Amino acid sequence: MTLYDVIIVGGGQAALSVAYFLRRTNRSVLILDAEDAGGGAWQHGWDSLRLFSPANWSSIAGWPMPSSGEQYPSRDHVVSYLRRYEARYSLAVQRPVLVTAVEPRDHGFAVKAGDRSWDARVVVSATGTWRNPVIPELEGRSAFGGLQVHSAHYVSPSAFQGLRVMVVGGGNSGAQILAEVSQVAASTTWATLSPPAFLADHVDGRVLFERATVRWQAIQEGRDPTDLPGGFGDVVMVPPVVEARARGVLHAVGTFERLTAEGAQWADGTSRTVDAILWCTGFKPALQHLESLGVVSDNKVIVDGTRACDVPGLWLVGYGEWTGPASATLIGVMRTARSTATEIDQYLTAQVLA
């Protein structure tokens, strides 16, 4: 039986970042990735997906993302970068391994994937959110007779040619998908809970990272980060979204009250007939593998930083604000990955000395 010091569940940017910093500790580390190949959830992004920050603002630790020759790197460029990163640092990865359970043992944990099992003193959960897309439970959703697709499974606008399409969700994915679908659809409706907030044309995702930095500093100083101005939901005006604005497409209506067989109905009695709904309604953390530990509540685990409070030896990285400001982004996960690796090394050293 091989007993690893650390097993990292997940193979995307968060997993690679933690593994990079753990290289400096000479601990034995194994990454278990559910995907068939490297690249994390980026390889499931839609065909035209691009970052909304330049390559030099979209790197993980150690090796800067090479320039793509374009203002904003494409999905395929990001996937290639992550695969090359993995090879560059000779990170130990087994795939495809879909971890189904993490169970406590005297030595630490047994990490299960069907009838296979691995043993580790420490487990880092870095599975992200892609495998847990959210579609709100709304009246009439099952009665709607048209096409329903979550952004997790959206590929290209070709499937919506000539259709009356409703895009639900006011974030970056909603705006970007609306922009390209509106070029081929018969009509589009953009339904959002609140009016979308747009960044100025001359700024990009770097502003969001700078906001995250200010919030991180506030947390380190014991200040309340919720009192700081600016959020992370603002829509970045990438070229396709700017072009859609020029066509008058970026007009959002309030969210509807219910769905019908033919479309949607609002609280004021107005209704719209649509053939397809694109749910750009986000994701929740993919934590199903941790349910066996009894620590998952409301799709979260109680953490101090990234360390699970109720399970010694468990850390969670890259799930968003509750595991660190901007920790679900390429450049933003660096801080929490570094601190996580340091804490793990200290934890394992203390175990030996105990």
Each model region followed by its residue ranges:
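Histidine-centered active-site microenvironments of extracellular/periplasmic hydrolases
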Residues: L49
